[in-house]
UniProtKB/Swiss-Prot annotation:
Organism: Chlorobium luteolum (strain DSM 273 / BCRC 81028 / 2530)
Lineage, broadest ranks: Bacteria, Pseudomonadati, Chlorobiota, Chlorobiia, Chlorobiales
Protein's job: F(1)F(0) ATP synthase produces ATP from ADP in the presence of a proton or sodium gradient. F-type ATPases consist of two structural domains, F(1) containing the extramembraneous catalytic core and F(0) containing the membrane proton channel, linked together by a central stalk and a peripheral stalk. During catalysis, ATP synthesis in the catalytic domain of F(1) is coupled via a rotary mechanism of the central stalk subunits to proton translocation.
Alphabetic keyword roster: ATP synthesis, Cell inner membrane, Cell membrane, CF(1), Hydrogen ion transport, Ion transport, Membrane, Transport
Superkingdom assignment: Bacteria
Molecular function as annotated in GO: proton-transporting ATP synthase activity, rotational mechanism
Subcellular location as annotated: Cell inner membrane
Cellular-component GO terms for this entry: plasma membrane; proton-transporting ATP synthase complex
Name of the protein this chain belongs to: ATP synthase subunit delta
Pfam families in the cross-refs: OSCP (PF00213)
HAMAP family in alphabetical order: ATP_synth_delta_bact
Subunit (UniProt): F-type ATPases have 2 components, F(1) - the catalytic core - and F(0) - the membrane proton channel. F(1) has five subunits: alpha(3), beta(3), gamma(1), delta(1), epsilon(1). F(0) has three main subunits: a(1), b(2) and c(10-14). The alpha and beta chains form an alternating ring which encloses part of the gamma chain. F(1) is attached to F(0) by a central stalk formed by the gamma and epsilon chains, while a peripheral stalk is formed by the delta and b chains.
Membrane topology qualifier: Peripheral membrane protein
Amino acid sequence: MSSVIASRRYAYALLSAADEGGFLDDVTAEMEMIGETLAGSRDLVRVLASPLINGDRKTHILEEIFRGRVGERMMRFLSLIARKKRAGILRGIASEFKVLLDEKNGVVNADVTSATELSGEQAKELVNGLAAYTGKHVRARMTLDPEMIGGVSVQIGDTILDGSIRHQLQVLRRTLSVEEA
């Protein structure tokens, strides 16, 4: 089983248990902190992924790092994944947990690229339009691309909405070349 599939299954099980048990907010904060800790420590990620370190030792390492920072339920979860030889996918579990939580809450992430910085009003209008388009709450991450001639390009999951001038010129060029043929 691929690590992405396993990460998603563990994340789903954790999310479901936390939601049903009424402690989703606590688990969400703890998973976010665990994800940030792993993102900031390549050595920890390597240790957890190492087949040379047994599950008991990984459990001890996780306890040393997270005891007092997470609740007892989360410590049991961390111990479980270490015993099941899945500590190496903990970062993936944290990432998938965030994705599943967003899905549950009706949130989509949009990567918005523009040639120039959008004003607050333009950004708000764009986000509102994307929310109407998707039917979900939109969390937008704005980036600038000086290579763009103008316009805006938006990526939501696998969908790309390209309103850049460069794209419009490419469409026009293709249309004209088809008409010439």
